[in-house]
């Protein structure tokens, strides 16, 4: 019996005397295939399978005991030696038992490996099994602390920038107030200069009026003198010739008339002066009102302009702060995305490696399952072979005569090898039976 090898037939002569043999095959005498070999160069002849002789007409087909299911013609087995079949029964059984024990040991080791691989697969497939990932928590804490410091520094910088801008706005306010006060001072000085010119004109007008009054006084004095001279001349001409009594009003006191005229002129002058002063006061008041309203409007416009400037600067500062905050948030988002993408890539690599290991384990498991099935088939064939050997031994023990060496050998008998080229390698020796031999 040979395992994992091709069936080998032994012959010392070609099968020339057997009818129906188309071809004759040869193999070395007294050879049988050793386990785990397929060449006939390492074959040995088991002594327990030898027959002294077989009938010449023994050409009935026999089958391989290892499940080869291919018939071979059995004549006189030239690979069977002279001797008794029962002489090597113990050695044969020992040999078969050793082979069976080795196969069982191999099956047991493969089952242990299979169980170990199943345990590993079960551990890998457990859903709640924690994935071993590197601990980056302290790095995350450091990064978060630095980010907080950066945000605090940015906020402090923004606050200082706001304070600087507020100081600039206050300086601009004071500068604008100084400019407005300077413009008001210049306007007041211009008004004072204009009023001084008006005062000079009024002084000149007053001088002219006083000179006119003096000239009128001189004219009045001249008129009085002329009237007195005329009166005296008329009196001298009339003399005492004419005495005229007129019932007329009493004579007018010239001093009184002059005083009245003086009072009248003084009243007119006072009225004119009062009117001029009122006109000047009204014009001055109107100019002051216009100046005040213009100053108020200018101050309101300047205040509104400063307020708008302040609002524009505040909005610009807020815009810069929001842009800085947006940039910092975008940087933070980019860093977070890069960090999570790195973690995702690491997890994906870990998943790929685990899947690769799982695929390798599955391949190993399938391969070991195939090997296990092959070993189970081999075990079944071995058990069948052992049972066959046991039955053959029992039959041969019952059929052999007391003197097993008395039989005469039959010449020109061979055992034909399996002619089916598609047959699988037999896992047992070729058994030559004599059940169908023609007597």
UniProtKB/Swiss-Prot annotation:
Positions of region (Head): 1-89
Domain IF rod: 89-400
Keyword Coiled coil assigned: yes
InterPro entries: IF_conserved, IF_rod_dom, Keratin_I
Residue segments, region Tail: 397-439
Site (Stutter): 338
Region called Coil 1B, residue ranges: 136-236
Protein family according to the UniProt entry: Belongs to the intermediate filament family.
Function according to Swiss-Prot or TrEMBL: May play a role in late hair differentiation.
Record protein name field: Keratin, type I cytoskeletal 40
Lineage of source species: Eukaryota, Metazoa, Chordata, Craniata, Vertebrata
